[in-house]
């Protein structure tokens, strides 16, 4: 009588299990990466939307945003929590940082986009350091009746690394 000694798994079966685990892991990492990118995109969109709405609410009665800048907007609570100060020195605040690490600036402008002059009754939001797909998503948003918003400037010719 021949004894059969087949109590364990074969090496081929174990390699198959490892391959399945590897495929599932790669899928999970890709899914997580896409989810984080969507989260960051939504953070930027929400921040811009809240900033526009807050400026509209705060300056609606005045019908003039002369002198509005990032520091004044931050001090007045116009800039939401989605955007963080770019440095610890809030007295010298010139921009805030969005979720992709780029900058956001709020500036008073004339209707033709000049940042100086006595008739700066409009404002612009300047966003730099966005990936191309996020810039496109923001550019295609319907901003509705955004009051005195002249423009949302995206990247100003700069791209974030790798995009």
Residue ranges, per PLM feature:
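Weak global preference for isoleucine
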Residues: 2, 12, 20-21, 29, ...
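Periplasmic/extracellular, small/polar-rich flexible segments of pilin-like filament-forming proteins
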Residues: 61-163
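Membrane-proximal N-terminal amphipathic helix
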Residues: 33-68, 72
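N-terminal single-pass transmembrane signal-anchor helix
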Residues: 1-47
